[in-house]
């Protein structure tokens, strides 16, 4: 066998052994981190910042839409399509101006 096959086989066996070892470990033995400050029946305990205990009268971040109507947000409807008549008229005006420029430099 070539060295590459031996190396690949060794890596496969080592990976398998590592997976078996990790899966056999008991992961639930560790200490569970809780949130004691979020329990509703406990009184507020902020001695340094008593204002943190009282609910604020004004929201921390007031609502903003994110963009104004003039900038046409993604959720707004797209602009109305240009009619064929307007496209033809605009092309004729452009062609006439271009031809006038070419004829009279």
Curated annotation (Swiss-Prot):
Annotated protein name in UniProt: Protein RALF-like 21
Keywords carried by this UniProt record: Disulfide bond, Hormone, Secreted, Signal
Subcellular location: Secreted
An example Gene Ontology molecular-function term: hormone activity
One Pfam short name: RALF
Signal peptide: 1-30
Transmembrane segments: none
Gene: RALFL21
PANTHER family linked to this entry: PROTEIN RALF-LIKE 15-RELATED (PTHR34270), PROTEIN RALF-LIKE 16-RELATED (PTHR34270:SF3)
Disulfide bonds: 44-53, 67-73
Organism name: Arabidopsis thaliana (Mouse-ear cress)
Family per record: Belongs to the plant rapid alkalinization factor (RALF) family.
Any one of the GO BP annotations: regulation of growth
One cellular component (GO) term of this entry: apoplast
């Amino acid at each position: 066998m070539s060295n590459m096959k031996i190396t690949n086989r060794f890596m496969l066996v080592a990976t398998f052994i590592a997976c078996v070892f990790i899966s056999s470990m008991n992961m639930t033995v560790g200490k569970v981190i809780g949130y004691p400050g979020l329990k509703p029946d406990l009184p507020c305990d902020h001695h340094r910042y008593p204002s943190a205990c009282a609910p604020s009268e004004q929201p921390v971040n007031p609502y903003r839409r994110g963009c104004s109507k003039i900038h046409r947000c993604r959720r707004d409807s797209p602009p109305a399509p240009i009619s064929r008549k307007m496209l033809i008229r605009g092309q004729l005006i452009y062609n006439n101006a271009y031809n006038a420029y070419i004829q009279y430099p």
